[in-house]
């Protein structure tokens, strides 16, 4: 896959590809090992034909990636969208999942074609300052996601124990379960992937059960799913749509998927093998995200049926008249619309459909939190290794990430109430949306570079679609910031927001600039940024082939 693209020299410097050696030789495992220490062989089959054996060999990375579409942040976003808008935002969920699939397709393609993940490519192409800032934003996204997993798991333990396990106790339990997953990882890659498949199955069965007992109106559901409209919607519904996009398309997941696909042995000296790997990974990702979409649909439909336009007084009466009457006081006795969260959601399901519905909901929520734990650990490890060439053991990495996530969460759990914890979950969903450009812009940049991707670079249609995604995300984020400013508690906060906004816009502008260079705006390419047109300078090519 080596070779120059474009002019062989530019300003006296030779540019070219960074592709690693094409032979699928296993890499040396770093201290403590990683998911990529084991390579899955691909069976030989007749060329040009579809093979279920090959699809099975490629199956795994897409399902691990899809777990980010099912974490507790997504579950909370789903139930709130159902409670606020009924079935009206189902089409947003559908198209957000489709857009997520398009982004993940680019991530998988980058990993397959170059043999490097997005973090490694960023390390080679971006200068030091933007590279470090980019790394920090993705680490922030990972910690934010981990906090959501901690919150979801703690609430699940509280529901399963009927409140006997306090929220802070559930938060601390998540430390123990994380190291259980690290222990499980020692049993091999395929067993780990199978275990995550088992957790996804639990979510499908538990949330599917809630869907069956709730019996949503199918006609209204199909209308909300396929008719892109929202009659009678206002700012609450629009902000909820923003939350759906932020929860579904998560920035660190793009970095994660580009690394996960490297676990399969693909002979990158053969274009046919690369093309075949891209096809099978796309099929697998489509299947995985279809499953995740159905699970999210179950949750949104259940709460669209059970909670839409429900008042606090009505929820109180329902619980007071049920076998779970002890939970009734969590709903204020007023006529305001219920501000539902993942805790109240489980309670009202139990009040409406019996205690089994509450416990089954809690099991599904627990599976969502647990399944997200390990993928977040891997994402953090891959991002750190890619951006910084700093290799830590999984133990050290998970200790750092989980410590950053647990400290603020346990403080909230001890000194504040459940509503503050759920409110933090909502804020973290918005944070993911705000940080999304720092994943989508780099993946669009590098997959559009012929010098890097050669014949597998984005075509015109792909560039238009992914660029439209980026414009949509930026517009949504701008709308959120404008809507959020009036809610700041004190004018002094405006200066802090202005400072953060300046840094945010500065980094985003730089990433847009480099992205435009790869889209054909050659006049923007100066000095060291010629590499975004022609590839790495000759002196950096060998470093690019041997790094990682």
Curated annotation (Swiss-Prot):
InterPro entries: NRAMP_fam. Pfam families: Nramp (PF01566). Residues 74-82, 161-164, 215-237, 305-346, 416-426, 486-493 are extracellular. GO terms for molecular function: cadmium ion transmembrane transporter activity; iron ion transmembrane transporter activity; manganese ion transmembrane transporter activity; metal cation:proton antiporter activity. Glycans are attached at residue 335. It catalyses: Zn(2+)(in) + H(+)(out) = Zn(2+)(out) + H(+)(in); Fe(2+)(in) + H(+)(out) = Fe(2+)(out) + H(+)(in); Mn(2+)(in) + H(+)(out) = Mn(2+)(out) + H(+)(in). Keywords: Endosome, Glycoprotein, Ion transport, Iron, Iron transport, Lysosome, Membrane, Transmembrane, Transmembrane helix, Transport. GO terms for cellular component: endosome membrane; late endosome membrane; lysosomal membrane; phagocytic vesicle membrane; plasma membrane. It is a multi-pass membrane protein. Residues 1-38 are annotated as: Disordered. The chain crosses the membrane at residues 56-73, 83-102, 140-160, 165-184, 194-214, 238-256, 285-304, 347-366, 398-415, 427-447, 464-485, 494-513. Belongs to the NRAMP family. Macrophage-specific antiporter that fluxes metal ions in either direction against a proton gradient. Localized to late endosomal lysosomal membranes, delivers bivalent cations from the cytosol into these acidic compartments where they may directly affect antimicrobial activity. Involved in iron metabolism and host natural resistance to infection with intracellular parasites. This is Natural resistance-associated macrophage protein 1. It comes from Bos taurus (Bovine). The gene is SLC11A1.
């Amino acid at each position: 896959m080596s070779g120059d693209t474009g002019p062989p020299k530019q300003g006296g410097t030779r540019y070219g590809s960074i592709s690693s050696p094409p032979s699928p030789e296993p890499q040396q495992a770093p201290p403590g090992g990683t998911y990529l220490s084991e390579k899955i062989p691909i069976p030989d089959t007749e060329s040009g034909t579809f093979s279920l054996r090959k699809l099975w060999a490629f199956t795994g990375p897409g399902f691990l990636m899809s777990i980010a579409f099912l974490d507790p942040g997504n579950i909370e976003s789903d139930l709130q969208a159902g409670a606020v808008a009924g079935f009206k935002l189902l089409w947003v969920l559908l198209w957000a999942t489709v857009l997520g699939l398009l982004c993940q397709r680019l991530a998988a393609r980058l990993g397959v074609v170059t043999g490097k993940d997005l973090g490694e490519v960023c390390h080679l192409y971006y200068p030091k300052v933007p590279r470090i800032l980019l790394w920090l934003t993705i680490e922030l996204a990972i910690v934010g996601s981990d906090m959501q997993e901690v919150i979801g798991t703690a609430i699940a333990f509280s529901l399963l124990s009927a409140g006997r396990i306090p929220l802070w106790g559930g938060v601390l339990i998540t430390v123990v379960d994380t190291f259980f997953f690290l222990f499980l990882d020692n049993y091999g890659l395929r067993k780990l992937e199978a275990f995550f498949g088992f957790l996804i199955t639990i979510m499908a069965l538990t949330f599917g059960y809630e869907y069956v007992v709730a019996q949503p109106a199918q006609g209204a559901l199909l209308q909300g799913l396929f008719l892109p409209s929202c009659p009678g919607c206002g700012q609450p519904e629009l902000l909820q749509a923003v939350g759906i996009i932020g929860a579904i398309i998560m920035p660190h997941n793009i970095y994660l998927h580009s690394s996960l696909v490297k676990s399969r042995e693909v002979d990158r000296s053969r274009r046919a093998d690369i093309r075949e790997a891209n096809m099978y990974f796309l099929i697998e990702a489509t299947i995985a995200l279809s499953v995740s979409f159905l699970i999210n649909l179950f949750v949104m439909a259940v709460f669209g049926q059970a909670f839409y336009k429900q008042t606090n007084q009505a929820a109180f009466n329902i619980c007071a008249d049920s076998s779970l009457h002890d939970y009734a006081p969590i709903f204020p006795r007023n006529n305001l619309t219920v501000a539902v969260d993942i805790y109240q959601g489980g309670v009202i399901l139990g009040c409406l459909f019996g205690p089994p519905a509450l416990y089954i909901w809690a099991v599904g929520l627990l599976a969502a939190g647990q399944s997200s734990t390990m993928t977040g650990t891997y994402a953090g490890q891959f991002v750190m290794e890619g951006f910084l060439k700093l290799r830590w053991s999984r133990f050290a990495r998970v200790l750092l990430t989980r410590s950053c996530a647990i400290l603020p969460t346990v403080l909230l759990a001890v000194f504040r109430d459940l509503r503050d914890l759920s409110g933090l979950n909502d804020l973290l969903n918005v944070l993911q949306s705000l940080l999304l450009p720092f994943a989508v812009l780099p993946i669009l940049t590098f997959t559009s570079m012929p010098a890097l991707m050669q014949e597998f670079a984005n075509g015109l249609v792909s560039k238009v679609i992914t660029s439209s995604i980026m414009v949509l995300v930026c517009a949504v984020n701008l709308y959120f910031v404008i809507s959020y400013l009036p809610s700041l508690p004190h004018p002094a906060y405006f200066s802090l927001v202005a400072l953060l906004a300046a840094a945010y816009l500065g980094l985003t502008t730089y990433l847009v600039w480099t992205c435009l260079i790869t889209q054909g705006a050659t006049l923007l390419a100066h000095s060291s940024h010629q590499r975004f047109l022609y590839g790495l300078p000759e002196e950096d090519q060998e470093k690019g082939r041997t790094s990682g």
